[in-house]
Amino acid sequence: MAQYKGTMREAGRAMHLIKKREKQKEQMEVLKQRIAEETIMKSKVDKKFSAHYDAVEAELKSSTVGLVTLNDMKAKQEALLREREMQLAKREQLEQRRIQLEMLREKERRRERKRKISNLSFTLDEEEGDQEDSRQAESAEAHSAGAKKNLGKNPDVDTSFLPDREREEEENRLREELRQEWEAKREKVKGEEVEITFSYWDGSGHRRTVRMSKGSTVQQFLKRALQGLRRDFRELRAAGVEQLMYVKEDLILPHYHTFYDFIVAKARGKSGPLFSFDVHDDVRLLSDATMEKDESHAGKVVLRSWYEKNKHIFPASRWEPYDPEKKWDRYTIR
């Protein structure tokens, strides 16, 4: 290695410039890492919300045993939703604290490297390095004292990794505002009305339409449909809602599900989407039944007694209970 030949002052100046370049390079690396972490956190948002409904549905399914009333089911579903949202918020806060701790450890490692380098440098450089470290420590203490004492803070020092009560309270407040805004939008969508075309099925179809809000449950829909069907069908005059089934796209839908659940999850059945309630031609009657189309068919309102007698005959032989974990990404004709 070539030996530097010059005065002690020039050697100290050269070493100072080298340390300054190293510091700028480290700051650039920290900035790149922070940008990459923010990008990763933003990319995880959609995945969190897409997995949110499936996790709540799985928890509801595992915690419900036997027959329960509709009110108990709805209360349990809403409680699970609130608990899931609080867990996601807490997990996000823990992730942010973990990142802050990692940045703090990285800062300590950089200081340790600087300390080792300064031991090999000249006395002049050691004094300058000590003064710079003391200024950074004083700036960090001034930042932790609160916003009222920030007048003497060095604006060039990065203190984002330090704990800040006011910043955490502001983040929690913003997170709560976003949650309330999301709740308000969800309630607004639930209040929107949609026209549902269905067919009472007793071996042949008898088509009817009703208007329901998207937040209505399948049981509420069957109750409204039964009120209109009793006038025309004698076998329904003594029937109750619990004796009826709602079959959509060859799937038997549970009474406690809401239409909003299928819309948010964009759930699909064997022959079409469960989140669309307008009517198109049956895909099995088209020229090419293997072509997947975003088309919906009229759901069937059926007596359970009729289904038990005819479940070995088409079309009842195709019907099966709805399972949110089972995906029907392509149409089936068998």
Swiss-Prot record:
What Gene Ontology cellular-component terms does the record carry?
intercellular bridge; midbody; nucleoplasm
Compositional bias (Basic and acidic residues): 132-141, 163-175
- Give the top-rank taxon of the lineage listed in the UniProt record for this protein: Eukaryota
Signal sequence span is none
Q: In which tissues is it expressed?
A: Widely expressed. Abundant in testis, where it is expressed in seminiferous tubules, not in the interstitium. At the cellular level, expressed in primary spermatocytes and round spermatids, but not detectable in spermatogonia, elongating spermatids, mature spermatozoa, Sertoli cells or Leydig cells.
Residue ranges the record marks as coiled coil: none
Keyword annotations from UniProtKB, A to Z: Acetylation
Region of interest (Disordered), ranges: 122-175
Q: Which InterPro entries match?
A: FAM50A/XAP5_C, XAP5
Q: Which residues carry this modification: N-acetylalanine?
A: 2
So what family is this one in?
Belongs to the FAM50 family.
Q: What is this protein called?
A: Protein FAM50B
